[in-house]
Amino acid sequence: MFFRTSSLFTTIVAFTVMAAAMPGNPKPTTTTVTVTAPAHPTATAPASECKTGPVQCCNSVQSSKSPAASLLLGLLGIVLQGVAVPVGLTCNPITVIGVGGNSCSAQTVCCENNNFSGLIAIGCTPINLSL
């Protein structure tokens, strides 16, 4: 009986020491905050006006507040605080020269932030390739 009581006591002490050694607060997570200018209704611009990178062909362009865009932004850890900006979903760069081979059957846009491997582009403005 003494052996079992001492084993139980030793086990309780061991668990107490291990619990005391573990940190109580987890390490804080880092959140990426992307700040863009608030979206204003804009007219379609000519492709030559895209100064932020290549013209993009996006499957859809939605508000950053839409469920699909919010989900992707959240999964990527991107926070757009207090603004609703147009974002392009599933985008590929296209060249304006030689449009015949690089046509876009979806929406052509010029976006401010295209650094997410085509999954999402932030701050998009519609582009007219025929201008």
From Swiss-Prot:
GO terms for molecular function: structural constituent of cell wall. Pfam families: Hydrophobin. Residues 1-21 form the signal peptide. Keywords: Cell wall, Disulfide bond, Glycoprotein, Secreted, Signal. InterPro entries: Hydrophobin, Hydrophobin_CS. Glycans are attached at residues 115, 128. Its main location: secreted. It is found in: Secreted; Secreted, Cell wall. The keyword Manganese does not apply. The keyword Signal applies. It comes from the Eukaryota. Belongs to the fungal hydrophobin family. Aerial growth, conidiation, and dispersal of filamentous fungi in the environment rely upon a capability of their secreting small amphipathic proteins called hydrophobins (HPBs) with low sequence identity. Class I can self-assemble into an outermost layer of rodlet bundles on aerial cell surfaces, conferring cellular hydrophobicity that supports fungal growth, development and dispersal; whereas Class II form highly ordered films at water-air interfaces through intermolecular interactions but contribute nothing to the rodlet structure. This is Class I hydrophobin POH2. It comes from Pleurotus ostreatus (Oyster mushroom).
